[in-house]
């Protein structure tokens, strides 16, 4: 949270609202749930993460930096600057560790649905009963604005129909839009709608409760025949004097409010300061854990290649794009 406040303040541009209320969820996801390898961000069997609400990019960048991706503290200081590695919305061709570019609200869930379809297709085509080389999840963080977009529901309907159990959406329900309270423009019962689309719906009453978020994510992972949506109640701009209002949605906190927000978190340090114990925590719980998962997967791949050489050759060519396809032939 503190890094994000500093990034947005220095740029004098950005969206702190969702960043501050969604930080506990993504901290939990990165450090306790996702299997990723910052040393090899292109690892084929890594879990995927899609930031549907791309305006909350500072939160993703802070997590990528802390996790050990090729994103320095100086890069964070260049947030939203021309030709920086930390643009206003994430771009897969610019920033190490970004799995999906973000654009207009609504596109994140469809993008993730496509990823989950690809995972399921590859798993069913190549996995064997004694050897699974494709086995990863796709996670999404979305907000109220995404739920107001029709394409989100179209993709969600397809995901439920296809039983994409490895698609997990975290819905940051802070009930505030840039224009004001969500009630001005939206009153749907999202829970009932997703239940009707064959999704598992899990509710978290407090978006600051890391233990509850962790339990919800683990429960979601166990349901392999339905996609899951975790409806998480949050307070937009948590810690700001304007928390809970649209004033904190898309404007920097400023020096005074930013400092007071940090104090409310129990963090009283200079801008962009990161304690060494924080880096150590992320190294242990993200990088080291991900490296172990990667090495375990490599052993599985070696076993698979030995037992099923033809299937492995086909899989490898498909993944690496080594096929020549000509529809005229």
Functional labels for PLM-detected ranges:
Residues 1-138, 280, 284-329:
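Thiamine diphosphate
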């Amino acid at each position: 949270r503190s890094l994000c406040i500093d990034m947005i303040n220095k740029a004098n541009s950005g969206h702190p609202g969702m960043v501050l209320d969604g930080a506990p969820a993504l901290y939990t996801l990165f450090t306790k749930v996702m299997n990723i390898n910052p040393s090899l961000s292109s690892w084929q069997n890594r879990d995927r993460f899609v930031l549907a609400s791309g305006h909350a990019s500072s939160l993703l960048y802070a997590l990528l930096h802390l996790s050990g991706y090729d994103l320095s503290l100086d890069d964070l200081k260049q947030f939203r600057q021309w030709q920086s590695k930390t643009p206003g919305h994430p771009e897969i061709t610019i920033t190490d560790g970004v799995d999906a570019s973000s654009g207009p609200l609504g596109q994140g869930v469809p993008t993730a649905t496509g990823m989950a379809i690809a995972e399921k297709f590859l798993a069913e085509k190549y996995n064997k009963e004694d050897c699974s080389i494709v086995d990863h999840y796709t996670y999404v963080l979305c907000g109220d604005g995404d739920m107001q977009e029709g394409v989100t529901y179209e993709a969600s309907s397809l995901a439920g129909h296809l039983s994409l159990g490895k698609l997990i959406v975290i819905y940051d329900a802070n009930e505030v839009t840039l224009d004001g309270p969500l009630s001005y423009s939206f009153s749907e019962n999202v829970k009932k709608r997703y239940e009707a689309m064959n999704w598992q719906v899990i509710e978290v009453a407090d978006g600051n409760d890391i233990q509850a978020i962790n339990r919800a994510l683990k429960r979601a992972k166990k349901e392999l025949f339905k996609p899951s949506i975790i409806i998480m109640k949050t307070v937009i701009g948590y810690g700001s004097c304007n928390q809970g209002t649209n004033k904190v949605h898309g404007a920097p906190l400023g020096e005074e409010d930013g400092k007071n927000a940090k104090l409310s978190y129990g963090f009283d340090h200079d801008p962009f300061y990161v304690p060494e114990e924080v880096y150590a925590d992320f190294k242990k719980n993200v990088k080291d854990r991900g490296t172990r998962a990667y090495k375990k997967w490599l052993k599985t791949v070696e076993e698979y290649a030995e037992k099923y050489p033809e299937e492995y050759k086909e899989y490898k060519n498909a993944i690496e794009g080594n096929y020549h396809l000509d529809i005229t032939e």
